[in-house]
């Protein structure tokens, strides 16, 4: 009886106690106030949570699949180098996966290749697959090739990124970028209470050259596409070409195009002119370091000598198609009839290029002071009918050059232009010498003439510095695409290669540390204050965009993580393939289990010796390397990089919670006082 009396509580006190507990539970659910005592042994926050992940994963909507471009890792993006990473194969069906956000691409590609019989090499894009919507330069390649396969795959196991769809194959006439797909926690978009932008479909470009979405198309002609003897010609117009023998950047090609126009070096006859650039010229001049971070450089072009051969109009077309022109493409693949965009009619020496709504004026290539001619040794050149004829040959000596300056300065509200004034051109008269050329002329001599029929004989001598990867992948062509890929992956994880890991990283410091992403905008959502320093709220209302800045190369680490994960998955693929073969072998053994003529191996012969390789250690080493690089690595303090907004806004949730607790306690005391 005494014990029962102790356990019983007065009815009024029980009501007050229950009300107090319900109030605590309610505020705990609202403000996430912990009910227990938290100390160091029960709560541990990692460096990533403290320093980087200010935007926590509050919902699964923030977890986005993002397409990361391979060019962010510093891979070669020129057309001769990029095409060596692709190969044809039959018997493998294409795979397509979707992704939600993509990275802005500096270089994209568009292929229209035909077989010698006129049939198409690449399949048409299925319904729903559109071109990659954010490309600074679109390299459009037309031509012919053997195309030994049904589909064109990536030899390194990467995807071809289209508009929110990643495919394992290349589609005809559809712009794509090379990349991989990774998952990121993107900051949650803030509500815009002043305007609500409707949901719009992505567009490839705009007609406004000052827009950050402006895209430029550069056109090429290719013969022997997909082979080691592929020849590429940069198209200036339908009769003027430039032979690509080294790693030409898009900016150099644009400046070269401007120089050819303004100096009057285009073909003014019915024959084709094929230019050959002096191999001593630095073709990397004007290279851009991705979208936002430009290289401030001043280069002086050395005196150069260009030679060309006038090709008769009776000669065979280079690619079997009517050539197109280089043009600025505002979303369509139409060609231009003149050079109004690439070089204005008044021969202006200024090429306007744009990035993210900010202009950068690039002063054009050179000022021609004198153009001299020199006679060539008399040789003969066979014509189309096996006869010899004279060909006018010009040796152009550009003896004076001006500095080329690319100067890009960021401002908070407006675009900037280069301080270099426009250069002027003065082209002198050209004098022709009636000479003959020989088919066996050495093409390395810039003073001699070249022709499209024989310029591939020594083209490899001038660009050996960027053909290593392509020749390695093509050295074992009989093994097939997947075998080559697996062999390359296996080579990446050997002990000797890992010992040189730091040296490789230091030798290739071209990783893009910034992730400039685009994604389809949600209904009624717009950009918040987090992105105002770079783009302003909801630029054009088309994309939710941002620039993620992280210390210590976190984005570079993410790129490397995605690549290493891909390599590990390739090993899993090989292990699965071998296990499948082993299963077939076991099936055969079971089929002959009742046969007693020497056993299974005697019946199956050499097939009995197949044994699946154990790749567990290699995969484990790769995972350990990822853990060492991205988990155990300490991060620097980011306190110095916090501005006033990101510095105090992180205390808002804590302030709201403390204020709520104080209000709850005051309300509780008032209620208790009123009850009593």
UniProtKB/Swiss-Prot annotation:
Gene that specifies this protein: GP
Family stated for the protein in its record: Belongs to the filoviruses glycoprotein family.
Description of post-translational modifications: The signal peptide region modulates GP's high mannose glycosylation, thereby determining the efficiency of the interactions with DC-SIGN(R). N-glycosylated.
Region annotated Receptor-binding, chain positions: 54-201
Lineage: Viruses, Riboviria, Orthornavirae, Negarnaviricota, Haploviricotina
Transmembrane annotation, as ranges: 651-671
Protein name as catalogued: Envelope glycoprotein
S-palmitoyl cysteine lipid modification positions: 670, 672
Species this protein is from: Zaire ebolavirus (strain Kikwit-95)
Effect of residue 430 to P: In strain: Isolate Chain
Record-level Gene Ontology MF annotations: lipid binding
Extent of Low complexity compositional bias: 414-427
């Amino acid at each position: 009886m005494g014990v029962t009396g102790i356990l019983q509580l007065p009815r009024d006190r029980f009501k007050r106690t229950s009300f107090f507990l319900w109030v605590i539970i309610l505020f705990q659910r609202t403000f996430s106030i912990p009910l227990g005592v938290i100390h160091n042994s029960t709560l541990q926050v990692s460096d990533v949570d403290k320093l980087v992940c200010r935007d926590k994963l509050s919902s699964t909507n923030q977890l986005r699949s993002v397409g990361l471009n391979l060019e962010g890792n510093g891979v070669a993006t020129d057309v001769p180098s990029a095409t060596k990473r692709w190969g044809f194969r039959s018997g493998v069906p294409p795979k397509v996966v979707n992704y939600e956000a993509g990275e802005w691409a500096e270089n994209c590609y568009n292929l229209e290749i035909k077989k010698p019989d006129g049939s198409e090499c690449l399949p048409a894009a299925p319904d729903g697959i559109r071109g990659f919507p954010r490309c600074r330069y679109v390299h459009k390649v037309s031509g012919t090739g053997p195309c030994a396969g049904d589909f064109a795959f990536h030899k390194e196991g990467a995807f071809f990124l289209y508009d929110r769809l990643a495919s394992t194959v290349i589609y005809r006439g559809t712009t794509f970028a090379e990349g991989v797909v990774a998952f990121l926690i993107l900051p949650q978009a803030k509500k815009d209470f002043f305007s609500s932008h409707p949901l719009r479909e992505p567009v490839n470009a705009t007609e406004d050259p000052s827009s950050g979405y402006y895209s430029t198309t550069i056109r090429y002609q290719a013969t022997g596409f997909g082979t080691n003897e592929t020849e590429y010609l940069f198209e200036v117009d339908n009769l003027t070409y430039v032979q690509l023998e080294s790693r030409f950047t898009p900016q150099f090609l644009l400046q070269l195009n401007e120089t050819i126009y303004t100096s009057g070096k285009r073909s003014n006859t019915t024959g084709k002119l094929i230019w050959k650039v002096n191999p001593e010229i630095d073709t990397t001049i004007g290279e851009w370091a991705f979208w936002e971070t430009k290289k401030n450089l001043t280069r002086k072009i050395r005196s150069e000598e260009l030679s060309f051969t006038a090709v008769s109009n009776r000669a065979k077309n280079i690619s079997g198609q009517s050539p197109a022109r280089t043009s600025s493409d505002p979303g369509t693949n139409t060609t231009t009839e003149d050079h109004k965009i690439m070089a204005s009619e008044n021969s202006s020496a200024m090429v306007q290029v744009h990035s993210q709504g900010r202009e950068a004026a690039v002063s054009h290539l050179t000022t021609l002071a004198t153009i001299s001619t020199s006679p060539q040794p008399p040789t003969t050149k066979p014509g189309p009918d096996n006869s010899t004829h004279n060909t006018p040959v010009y040796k152009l000596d550009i003896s004076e050059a001006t500095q080329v300056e690319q100067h890009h300065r960021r401002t908070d509200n407006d675009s900037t232009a280069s301080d270099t004034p426009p250069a002027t051109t003065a082209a002198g008269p050209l004098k022709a010498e009636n000479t003959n050329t020989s088919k066996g002329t050495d093409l390395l001599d810039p003073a001699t003439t070249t022709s499209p029929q024989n310029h591939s004989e020594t083209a490899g001598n001038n660009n050996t510095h960027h053909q290593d990867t392509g020749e390695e992948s093509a050295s074992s062509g009989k093994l097939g695409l997947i075998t080559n890929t697996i062999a390359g992956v296996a080579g990446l994880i050997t002990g000797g290669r890992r010992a040189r890991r730091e040296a490789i990283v230091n030798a290739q410091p071209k990783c893009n540390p910034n992730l400039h992403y685009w994604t389809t905008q949600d209904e009624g959502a717009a950009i918040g204050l987090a992105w105002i320093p770079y783009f302003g709220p909801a630029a054009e209302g088309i994309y939710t965009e941002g620039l993620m800045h992280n210390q210590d190369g976190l984005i570079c680490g993410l790129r490397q993580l995605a690549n290493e994960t891909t390599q590990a998955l390739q090993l899993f693929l090989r292990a699965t393939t071998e296990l499948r073969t082993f299963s077939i072998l076991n099936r055969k053994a079971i089929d002959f289990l009742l046969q007693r003529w020497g056993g299974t191996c005697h019946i199956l012969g050499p097939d009995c010796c197949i044994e699946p390789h154990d790749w567990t250690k290699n995969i484990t080493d790769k995972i350990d390397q990822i853990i060492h690089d991205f988990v155990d690595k300490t991060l620097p303090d980011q306190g110095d990089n916090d501005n006033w907004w990101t510095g105090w806004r992180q205390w808002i949730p804590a302030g709201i919670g403390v204020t709520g607790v104080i209000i709850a306690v005051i309300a509780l005391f008032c209620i208790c006082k009123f009850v009593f």
